[in-house]
Design a protein with these regions (language model features):
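Metal-cofactor-binding active-site regions of metalloenzymes
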Residues: 2-289, 341-343, 347-352, 356-359, ...
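Metal/cofactor-centered catalytic core regions of large enzymes
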Residues: 270, 316-319
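Short glycine/proline- and charge-enriched loop/turn segments
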Residues: 308-316
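Divalent-cation-assisted or electrostatically stabilized phosphate/pyrophosphate-binding catalytic cores
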Residues: 322-329
Length: 467
């Protein structure tokens, strides 16, 4: 058994160890942004094997496997579960210094009690042991969530989703709150008129509202927004390449909407105008309902045409975009603030060039009424690793108030990803412990720093989202 994942992993001094073990380690988890499948939660899904629960749908691992020269047949193809796992075990040693190496061994330790290093020599034992445990009811979906002391999760849901699985969970509670998140990205897809028309027809069908113009679409969205609120929704989310803040009248938005609904492609300026208009209207809905809006900014998606046609989206072929965000972002939030339509907001950047940009953008629009109203969010996606977390925490500390931060989230499709909260907590305590050790923070203020750790890891999120 390896001592790699030990009680003091990443905790380099006595202050870091004290902060983590006394004020972070045992706190509940609020996972306010994830991509779990609600049906699997509602049905208390039993996983067939470790390959399904660990490798299925995990584009982080898929990218690493491809980078290690593993054929696609062992990744998304028809090879057996054991063969796919063996290829992952062969790849893990080559992921050293990639966050996958830490995540892999934290998950093995925390979920399965396995402290061995995963490599070809240990693959058989680990595969068999994990599958033996997964055959037990103690390793079904709901049990895994309770195992990690998860208090609340927020899934990611389209406005046309029925939320039937959330309803079923609420009717048969199991100790974890599972709430929907409003993600209306498809209503911004006016640059693909064919699919946009199909989506509007779907929205019309579920609301019973005949949608012929822009105001009809807003009425239908408001009806679904109200329904999401009734189902416990407290957050919205937008995944975008950049911000949009073009001036657009209601009449212009209606004309552009009707143009797309007739199957015509709007020009680039019209696309930007429409996206700007609907984002402002959606933000106003969120503000009125007291929700928190999230903006995940900066991916360029589906870049490998051959593989996109073969596998579809979200399969490991996205990357970091380099569009400017500052001017449009500030103009967008300035409009909302001027019209008193700016509610709680979290900003996430994917391109590290935008780290300080986003941190300062957030703190330009606080109103002096709600502590931490505008948040610079956790390191996201390609930046969700130790270096990225430290840079995000340092930027927030230098340009805002770390003490008001709402903390970590998994952004994951996997029920095994909750150790990412532990990883964040250890890194946070390591940084603060180093500051105390070096004299940058006063040891005399340890009681407040302990409180600050607990706030960041749990209490701030609970209060901020009103869970």
């Amino acid at each position: 058994m390896s001592t790699f994942i030990n009680p003091d992993f990443l905790l380099g001094n006595k202050f870091a160890r004290e902060l983590y073990h006394e004020s972070a380690e045992n706190l509940p988890i609020i996972d306010y942004h994830c991509h779990l499948i609600p049906q699997q939660v509602a049905e208390n899904h039993k996983f067939a094997d470790i390959t399904e629960v660990w490798l299925g749908g995990d584009h982080y691992k898929w990218r690493a496997l491809r980078g290690n020269g593993v054929d696609e047949d062992y990744i998304t193809g028809g090879r057996s579960s054991r063969e796919k796992f063996e290829k992952w075990a062969e790849t893990v040693p080559y992921t050293m210094r990639n966050p996958l190496y830490h995540w892999t061994h934290l998950e093995l330790a925390r979920v399965f009690g396995i402290y061995d290093i995963l490599k070809p020599e240990t693959a058989d034992y680990i595969y068999n042991r994990c599958n033996e445990l997964l055959a037990s009811d103690d390793f079904r979906a709901q049990s895994l969530m309770k195992k990690f002391n998860v208090e609340t999760v927020c899934t990611t849901d389209d406005p046309t989703d029925t939320l039937e699985w959330h309803k079923r969970i609420a009717e048969k509670p199991f100790g974890v709150n599972v709430l929907p998140t409003w993600r209306p990205d498809k209503m911004l897809g006016i640059d693909d008129p064919e699919n946009f028309r199909k989506y509007v027809a779907k929205l019309s069908g579920i609301t019973g509202i005949m949608i012929s113009g822009y105001q009809d679409a807003l009425d239908a969205l408001q009806k679904r927004h109200d329904f999401f609120g009734q189902m416990g929704c407290r957050l919205s989310d937008h995944g975008m390449d950049t911000f949009y803040a073009e001036d657009c009248t209601r009449e212009e938005a209606d004309r552009i909407f009707r143009k797309a609904m007739q199957g015509q492609m709007p020009d680039c300026k019209e696309i930007a105008k429409f996206k700007s208009a609907i984002l402002l209207d959606l933000a106003a809905m969120d503000c009125k309902s007291g929700w928190t809006q999230q903006f995940h900014i900066g991916p360029i998606r589906n870049n490998n045409r051959k593989m996109f046609e073969r596998l579809g989206p979200d399969t490991g072929f996205d990357a970091i975009d380099d569009k400017p965000v500052a001017a449009a972002g500030h103009k967008f939030f300035s409009k909302l603030a001027y019209e008193d339509n700016l509610g709680k907001t979290i900003l996430y950047n994917l391109n590290p060039k935008d780290t300080e940009v986003m941190a300062t953008m957030a703190y330009t629009f606080n109103d002096g009424k709600t502590a931490g109203k505008m948040q610079y969010g956790a390191a996201w996606w390609f930046l969700d690793q130790e270096d990225g977390m430290r840079k995000q925490l340092n930027a927030l500390s230098s340009l805002g108030l770390l003490s008001r931060f709402v903390g970590m989230l998994t952004d994951s499709r996997s029920f095994l990803s909750y150790p990412r909260h532990e990883y964040f907590r250890r890194i946070l305590c390591s940084m603060l412990g180093d500051d105390i050790q070096s004299g940058r923070l006063p040891e005399s203020e340890l009681p407040f720093i302990h409180k600050m750790v607990g706030d960041i890891c749990y209490r701030n999120a609970k209060e901020y989202f009103q869970f």
